[in-house]
């Protein structure tokens, strides 16, 4: 995705430059086996996408420019579309449970895509009672229209928005 490599590098640089800023760093990733209609030869880039992040391929790995060592990686979307990190799990533990077990009450959300996975994860974090900030300089979105709509939804839900997203 356009801007994804720069986002991965920028996340790594920020975490390295401020190692005491976060108690925990976790990652989420698409981890597709057979997500059905989520994959399409003619994607609409809203509900359907080209094949990506397929288990057993290099594409499922976190980008090599993301040099952060996450405490846990939450896989999502094996057999159906999943946008929120809260739909995934790490070794059988879902993100909400992991955050509760680690007494997390605030979270910064970063990554791709601003208008899909970042939005869904941030909204679910707020629903879980977590004080949520999206660091927009560390995100990249699919399209200007969907990013603008997502930013409105995030703001309306009480998510703190900092910076400006990159848009492909």
For the regions a language model picked out, list residue spans one by one.
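Short, well-ordered alpha-helical scaffold segments within catalytic/effector domains
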Residues: 8, 92-96, 119
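Short catalytic/ligand-binding loop motif for oxyanion handling, primarily in non-cytosolic enzymes
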Residues: 33-37, 82-83, 118
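Short, surface-exposed loop/turn motifs that are enriched in glycine and acidic residues
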Residues: 51-56, 84-88, 111
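Glycine-rich anion-binding loop/nest that anchors nucleotide
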Residues: 104-120, 136-139
């Amino acid at each position: 995705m356009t801007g994804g490599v720069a986002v991965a590098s920028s996340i790594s640089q920020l975490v390295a430059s401020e190692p005491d800023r976060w108690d925990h760093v976790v990652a989420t990733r698409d981890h597709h086996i057979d997500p059905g209609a989520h994959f399409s030869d003619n994607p609409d880039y809203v509900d359907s996408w080209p094949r990506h992040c397929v288990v057993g391929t290099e594409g499922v790995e976190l980008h090599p420019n993301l040099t952060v060592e996450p405490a846990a990686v939450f896989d999502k979307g094996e057999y159906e579309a999943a946008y929120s990190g809260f739909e995934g799990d790490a070794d059988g533990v879902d993100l909400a449970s992991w955050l509760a077990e680690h007494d997390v009450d605030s979270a910064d959300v970063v990554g791709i895509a601003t208008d899909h996975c970042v939005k869904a994860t941030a909204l679910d974090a707020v629903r879980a009672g977590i004080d949520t900030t999206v660091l927009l300089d560390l995100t990249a979105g699919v399209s200007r229209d969907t990013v603008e709509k997502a930013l409105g939804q995030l703001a309306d839900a009480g998510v703190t928005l900092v910076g400006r997203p990159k848009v492909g």
